[in-house]
């Protein structure tokens, strides 16, 4: 490392930073009271190695970035938007417009959609007052509510104002029991937690600090044409992909094969690479003093290898690329409070600086382990609620920079704890705006010594960009208002297109905006902008390259292209035929899509030759317009087809519906417990590999009898078999014989027959019309309901003995005499045939006359009963 020959005024202190007798100038009200900077000396034509006379302009090969890799199969959810969190109605009596979070709507949605989460703790507290199964408790009727009946009441409850609205006793007891808790404790505590979560979500929408620094890196390969892109993938971004890419001169970059994958335990937030060359190690030996050479012991690194550092939320790891350019894990560590930044040392291979949310900064190397060098939970300049910390290296191997939202401080790792010097702070020294905060700090030591000094540091805020020299603290060498609509979280210092040329600086916003600056300032001159800044196309500018789509698919594509940018990488491909090489930019979106864009240098003499003052903000110079080719549109169409095959994100979680019909009873719960025990025994037997016996499963469930076959209405055989199958064959046979199994009816039947026979003695003939129209007796079934006697085969003759079966012995003689007077019936076989209605009536009347008993004179005369037909 060679410092410039002529140095600008600087602070030379003896001993460690912050521990010398010289008064500390970092807390002065203004640096103008102590120091003045000389004006930049005009450069002569001979010494003007910087080609600022012809400003460089990068021309994009396409109007927008193109997709390089096919979309991942994992669905992507864009998450919350500002419209979901803000209050839509206008707030009255407010002088200044302010952002108002709609807590009322959010808490109502939370109670409806996530009722199990909101009321689960209350359910456990009030479990003794609810009966979830079976019948209600008889001993605690006043303090125990049946959930099943309560759900029934709530299901039929009508809102107030309805004439059928009512409140049951259970609902009244439930409101008395849960009113004090549900009305005050849940609403107040849940509103506080929800408001805190909404504030965090709103801050995350404004600034997502998790991916500060970028999660996309380029690892050079064995030859200049080959390399690897390292980026996270997956729905949770917990898979680290290593995609090999070939850079062909005059053609688009192509990926080779499928990427290598490493599964991690958390989402990847930052990826940093650093190449280790043999020349750089020899240069370190020549620069370092004698007391630092002990740190440069020969390590396991190959002279031409690369290192890869990955930061997750609570883990950090380092990989090494050896001769075969395959990643080999060196070491991994866990950060309890959460990691916010990781940086690789450009001086000592394998050394890293790690920051945590607790305010601690540690040096970590696979050989020496972890060593804490700084810890301060408070911010540097003024109080700020953010716990974000950032660390980087400087031109000196043992001096680091630590940054937070209020400023940047330099630390001496060899000095006592707490010593240091402020490098940059937000305030009047830098003419900062109100509410301005530091978003990113980066060491620009990888710049070319002929373009920029190796002691520059980049400080980015949400409004401006600052260049600070570590040799002159608190003095911004350059301030420029970038004007990006989204937070500036990505910055890459690119190699110059040709020797002794201006050096491009690429800036990337969280919303996908890209800007390209050209920095110049070698020797003792102040760094300045060599030409106006240039705005590069973003991913949303590639929308015209896709075919016309339906509105729904078009909206999905736009949402995918508008995903936040979480990674940025730049590569200079080898172009032997061209005098100035081009530039390939890679972008990584939060959806996991990788886009690329080629830039070609173009000299434009119409631009201004001398840059204005550092503080002036010039209008952006847009790149020359290009046109889409058929190959570009075909590639976009193919990528779109693959995107449409990706399933959509799962729908928003909806509240489950509960019904009392699906609640289990005590027997069903017992059956479920027995089945669960059997499954547990089966799993244990399978795990041990032993034989499962019947006694291990308990008693077998009682086998239910098979269902009886369905019997027809007119098939007597089927009816008889069905009754016999059910075990009621004897009863069926008795019914067919005209008998009954009830003893009470058997005792009352002769008496009833006597009364009916006396009634029949009043008239010898019964009118059929009166018989059918009169109501039936309640104790005598209708004629069609009486069981029919079994049919007589046609071979049997109609004899008095055959028809007298089932008739008492004292009445058989009368029946024989009556049957003897009847004419023979040849058409109807047997007495099973039903006679005509008039004939049946005359038969019943004759039988009643024959059965009439003689009343004795001693018995009183009874009232004549009416006919029961």
UniProtKB/Swiss-Prot annotation:
Modified residues (Phosphoserine): 848
Single GO term (MF): RNA polymerase I core promoter sequence-specific DNA binding
Gene Ontology BP annotations: transcription by RNA polymerase I; transcription by RNA polymerase II; transcription initiation at RNA polymerase I promoter
InterPro entries hit by this protein: TAF1C, TAF1C_beta-prop, TAF1C_C, TAF1C_HB, WD40/YVTN_repeat-like_dom_sf, WD40_repeat_dom_sf
Region (Disordered): 605-629, 729-869
One Pfam family it belongs to: TAF1C_HB
Keyword presence, Membrane: no
Location of the protein in the cell: Nucleus, Nucleolus
Residue positions where Phosphothreonine is found in the record: 834
Biased composition (Polar residues): 835-860
Listed GO CC annotations: fibrillar center; nucleolus; nucleoplasm; RNA polymerase transcription factor SL1 complex
Known role: Component of the transcription factor SL1/TIF-IB complex, which is involved in the assembly of the PIC (pre-initiation complex) during RNA polymerase I-dependent transcription. The rate of PIC formation probably is primarily dependent on the rate of association of SL1/TIF-IB with the rDNA promoter. SL1/TIF-IB is involved in stabilization of nucleolar transcription factor 1/UBTF on rDNA. Formation of SL1/TIF-IB excludes the association of TBP with TFIID subunits. Recruits RNA polymerase I to the rRNA gene promoter via interaction with RRN3.
Subunit record text: Component of the transcription factor SL1/TIF-IB complex, composed of TBP and at least TAF1A, TAF1B, TAF1C and TAF1D. In the complex interacts directly with TBP, TAF1A and TAF1B. Interaction of the SL1/TIF-IB subunits with TBP excludes interaction of TBP with the transcription factor IID (TFIID) subunits. Interacts with MYC and RRN3. Interacts with p53/TP53; the interaction prevents the association of SL1/TIF-IB with UBTF and represses RNA polymerase I transcription.
Descriptive protein name: TATA box-binding protein-associated factor RNA polymerase I subunit C
Species of the source: Homo sapiens (Human)
The gene coding this protein: TAF1C
